[in-house]
Amino acid sequence: MRQAEIVRETKETKVRLAVNLDGTGRASIATGIGFFDHMLDLLARHARFDLEVEAKGDLHVDFHHTTEDVGIVLGQAIRRALGDMRGITRYADLHLPMDETLTRVALDISGRPFLVFRTEFKVGKIGEFDTELVREFFQAFASNAGVTLHVETLYGDNAHHIAESCFKGLARALRAAVAIDPAAAGEIPSTKGALGG
């Protein structure tokens, strides 16, 4: 089974996260941040990962540390669950519509962390959630998953829809990229014979 569980504890947060890449989309999410829980729930559902997240953080300060640290741990867990990445599809790209919004996501599970994030929000908050934290989550995730990730919102007005299209786009790209390619016969999808840098 391609699964992993990680616990990360700092002076700012404690995060326990478990992921099963070959799941059914079941999610149990509790970060103390309602909007972020919603984004993680739909990420699990659309990636069809089973995902458990328990996070306790310094929410009295703001939501930054918790959001970033969950991104760190999710990235680490997916990287660990993939193992040597043998047989995976590796690449995925798609356009994700959410009402008036359209976001393009391209992903390479390469072992080389890089993020291009071209998404702008017209407001600073969605409820109590700072919209700048969407990028912080994606940066933390890409850096720790070891993936090259491009996220670009081509157009959109509603901040909730923009954020949701980014998370759903990541979910669908992950679902496609981690899928086992039956034609690859268990090969590592790289001419170098290894992924990881």
From Swiss-Prot:
Q: What class of enzyme is it?
A: lyase
Annotated CDD domains: IGPD (cd07914)
Its keywords, alphabetically, are: Amino-acid biosynthesis, Cytoplasm, Histidine biosynthesis, Lyase
The annotated pathway is:
Amino-acid biosynthesis; L-histidine biosynthesis; L-histidine from 5-phospho-alpha-D-ribose 1-diphosphate: step 6/9
Task: Tell me where on the tree of life, at the top rank, the source sits.
Answer: Bacteria
Q: Name one Pfam family in it.
A: IGPD
What reactions does this protein catalyze? D-erythro-1-(imidazol-4-yl)glycerol 3-phosphate = 3-(imidazol-4-yl)-2-oxopropyl phosphate + H2O
Q: Name one GO cellular component term.
A: cytoplasm
Gene Ontology molecular-function annotations: imidazoleglycerol-phosphate dehydratase activity
Enumerate the Gene Ontology biological process terms: L-histidine biosynthetic process
Query: Which Enzyme Commission numbers does its entry carry?
Result: 4.2.1.19
Classification via InterPro entries: IGPD_sf, ImidazoleglycerolP_deHydtase, ImidazoleglycerP_deHydtase_CS, Ribosomal_Su5_D2-typ_SF
Regions crossing the membrane: none
Intracellular or extracellular location(s): Cytoplasm
Q: Which family does it belong to?
A: Belongs to the imidazoleglycerol-phosphate dehydratase family.
User: Which PANTHER family does the entry mention?
Assistant: IMIDAZOLEGLYCEROL-PHOSPHATE DEHYDRATASE (PTHR23133:SF2), IMIDAZOLEGLYCEROL-PHOSPHATE DEHYDRATASE HIS7 (PTHR23133)
HAMAP family assigned: HisB
Quote the NCBIfam families the UniProt record gives: PRK00951.1-5 (NF002109), PRK00951.2-1 (NF002111), PRK00951.2-4 (NF002114)
The protein's name: Imidazoleglycerol-phosphate dehydratase
Lineage of source species: Bacteria, Pseudomonadati, Pseudomonadota, Alphaproteobacteria, Hyphomicrobiales
